[in-house]
Amino acid sequence: MLASLQLRSYAPTCIMTIKAVFFDAAGTLMKPNRSVGESYAIFAADCGVKVTPSELSERFRLCFGEAPRLAFPGASDESIGGLEREWWKNLVARVFEPWGRFENFDKFFVELFDYFAEPGAWSLYPEVLDTLTELKGRRLPLSVISNFDSRLIKILHGLGVGSCFDQIFVSSRVGYAKPDPQIFHAALNHHNLIPAHVLHVGDSEINDRHGANSAGLRGVLVDRHSPADPNDRHRITNLEPILDLLE
């Protein structure tokens, strides 16, 4: 278990040469082909439960924000798969609380959970493959740090980018979730790097940019929904400007 890792002490440094790049996954590298609310509504309708996608999207945002972190410190590797599934089952049950837990909820949940495990449920953002290929061509170590679960490994390989990464760190297996500095330190320890030499790129201001900065890395926010800010080089609208940040 990575949760038991011993964190190194890092001395402050003014050397800012980038020697590795870490990425978040969902919202940064990939996106669901349908909104969460739409997928939930489709699978629920198959079980006779009619709820609009917009209602489910709003409930999901609320419940996900209130849920405990998807991390299981001290859990054995053998138990994590079951813990992940139970975590998501509890979350989905909370999402549907206003409409009651329907009779065939267990069947519904299995189908929903398995659907989101398939690469076909996801797509890469247009610039991702070219950007990762360019970074690998520069021989930079790349890793993923995500508050996801074990399904992410299959998804990234199915989307054709799994081999771009030296390691894929998911919070459920590391035992810590972003913005906790310890999940960033797990990746730093794996690569034997100090924080100031690493960019971390993600779509969450709190989990990615602030979390990485708090751990001593250089956090970069990817905000695909707002125009670029020429005064903030560490907020980008897609992954292409990462290449300029390496100069």
Task: Walk through the language-model features, giving the residues of each.
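Asp-based, Mg2+/Mn2+-dependent phosphohydrolase catalytic module
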Residues: 2-21, 31, 45, 54, ...
